[in-house]
Amino acid sequence: MTALPVIDIGPLLTMDDAAAIERTAGTIGAASADHGFFYVEGHGIADALFERLEAASHAFFALSEAEKARIAMVHGGTAWRGWFPLGGELTSGRPDRKEGLYLGEDLGADDPRVAAGWPLHGANLWPDGLPELRGAVEDYLAAAVAAAEALMRGMALALGLAADHFATGITRRPTLLFRIFHYPPGGVADDLGVGEHSDYGLLTLLGQDAHGGLEVRAADGSWIAVPPRGRALVVNIGDMFERLTRGRFRSAPHRVINASGRERLSWPLFYDPDFAASVDPLPIPATTRLLSRWDGGDVHGASGTYGDYLIGKVGKVFPELAGKALGDFG
């Protein structure tokens, strides 16, 4: 593999051309099985919205450390929201060379999930004096979720299921996590902005600025660059989709090395199962191509809810926060 497939998902947004829907779903299914990564165009997110988000993100990371620390993750409690400093996240057991802002579906205290004390559910933390950040994030998140829902329709059809199979099941109330990551300039070839990992949930929809650094590990073990392609999103399959499909869809390892000499921004949306859902494999044949995972883990042998799986993962990313924020859930 030298380049990822490029897929226009417009037909899955409008759902008004049966032949185009079938073709698009088939292409998504093939890309998910062969690569686990692909570019998405026709996603419905306007260029102007990307520009607003990029400008607001730069403005946030230009704030002083003291200003950003006012909304540090330690203040986010079980919601797991807020800012973390450079080196504050350990994706694969060593500090990543990035800082970031953890966000998600903005839920008030009256939401049943928040009232029940569910981790990773709650209110976002926003900096004072930067209202454009909240506006840009909320508008972008709404558009990106619509694109994710369209992709999930395509995934269902590719698997021979009804288009609304997931929307009426494990993503009826999805876990929505959104991040803004800032990679400073000055990295070198072996300086990992994000260490090798796979994503935990169903789908990741990644927006990125013009400075590359993302790499995906191909099935043959080689690393393939995933450079920006205009405002196309990069979509990848997560662990739970690999589990659901009995290995048919591939949750591919990936990493970030920012060796561009310039700062880099990215905006991943993690579109994941309902926190309380049991992610049981679909009644389809298991692939004969089950490969050893990069981390030695076994998503196919996992048990419990998606929340159980997710908490077990995020507690390793922020070990110092895990005990305080996750409490009895950790």
Regions found by a protein language model. Give the residues of each.
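Peripheral, non-catalytic segments flanking oxidoreductase cores
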Residues: 1-330
